[in-house]
């Protein structure tokens, strides 16, 4: 090969290398951009700088997951190490009994007023139902991988979102009768009085709505920068805490899900509860250790008050019969009881 030919070949190889490498880099960059963000988490709360409002009682280790029953007046609180469900008298704050669970839970709900309590036991891949007021386990149903949240339709059909499988299990009469696919990593589920099921994909960053009877999907819509929890409200609306985006998002459920409002709420909003009798919404701010009381006003929310909370207020519940509000303090094993104005 002549010196000139060698230079020509070397130049062509160099150009080919230059042209090839950026294409590969661009492909890797595009793949990285397509990868969904990690699931949002609550802020890690600093030590308290203000006395919590209302009363504070000791409830047990690492409480997270709470629901208040308007018929019995009991409050169910999920604990871990050991994995238990504490049944607390809402008025006095006294723990009446503790129910051993196969695994810990982070979300609780009621199948109906009066119970049973729906307990998605994450590590055991099961839905445990606990009767009220006695605390007896009425059923333990195998479901999908890492059940994170559960909610019941007016018909009694129960929907359990399986976070690691990106599915929802449908449970009737204590047994799983089927599954439906959901958005990536479903972390929250709620059902309207009209039988529409809202599922939040905490990594898919969407709200998807299903018909509870037919299981047909009515569609998906964006759910902010990092949604975590969803609650159903009046007029077939869903309220979603966008924890990473510092907001509460408001949606019409049907005929197709549509975002109709956004309320800015800095402070890492996380836990959320609806008081249907008073048309109020409660949201915990884990970065600021506050719980915020809102009035539901159509497409928006009107702030009523803020209350200092126990440390790491990840979950909140309201007893609609009394208006009493309960907040879990995960760090110190406490339950806060508020009598709002």
Please tell me what each predicted stretch does.
Residues 2-13, 18-341:
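Predominantly soluble domains enriched in secretory-pathway, periplasmic, or organellar proteins
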């Amino acid at each position: 090969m002549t010196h000139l030919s060698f230079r020509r070949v070397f130049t062509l190889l160099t150009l080919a290398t230059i042209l090839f490498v950026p294409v590969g880099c661009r492909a890797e960059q595009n793949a990285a951009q397509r990868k969904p963000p990690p699931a949002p988490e609550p802020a890690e709360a600093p030590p308290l700088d203000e006395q919590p409002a209302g009363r504070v009682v000791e409830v047990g280790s690492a409480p997270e997951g709470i629901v208040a029953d308007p018929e019995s007046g009991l409050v169910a609180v999920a604990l871990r190490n050991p994995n238990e469900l504490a049944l607390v008298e809402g008025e006095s704050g006294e723990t009446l009994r503790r129910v051993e669970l196969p695994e810990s839970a982070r979300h609780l709900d009621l199948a109906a007023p009066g119970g049973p309590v729906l307990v998605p036991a994450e590590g055991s891949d099961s839905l445990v139902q606990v009767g009220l007021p006695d605390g007896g386990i009425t059923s333990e149903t195998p479901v999908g991988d890492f059940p994170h949240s559960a909610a019941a339709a007016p018909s009694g059909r129960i929907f359990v979102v399986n976070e690691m499988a990106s599915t929802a299990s449908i449970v009737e009469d204590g047994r799983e009768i089927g599954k439906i696919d959901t958005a990536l990593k479903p972390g929250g589920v709620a059902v309207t009085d009209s039988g529409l099921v809202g599922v939040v994909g905490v990594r898919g960053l969407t709200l998807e709505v299903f018909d509870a009877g037919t299981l047909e999907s009515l569609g998906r819509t964006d759910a902010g920068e990092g949604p975590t929890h969803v609650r159903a409200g009046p007029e077939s609306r869903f309220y979603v805490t966008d924890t990473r985006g510092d907001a509460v998002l408001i949606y019409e459920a049907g005929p197709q899900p549509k975002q109709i409002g956004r309320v800015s709420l800095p402070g890492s909003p996380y836990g959320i509860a609806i008081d249907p009798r008073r048309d109020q919404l409660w949201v915990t701010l884990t970065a600021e250790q506050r719980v915020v009381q809102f009035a539901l006003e159509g497409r928006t929310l009107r702030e009523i008050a803020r209350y200092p909370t126990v440390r790491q207020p990840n979950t909140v519940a309201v007893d609609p019969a009394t208006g009493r509000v309960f907040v879990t303090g995960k760090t110190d094993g406490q339950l806060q009881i508020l009598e709002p104005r």
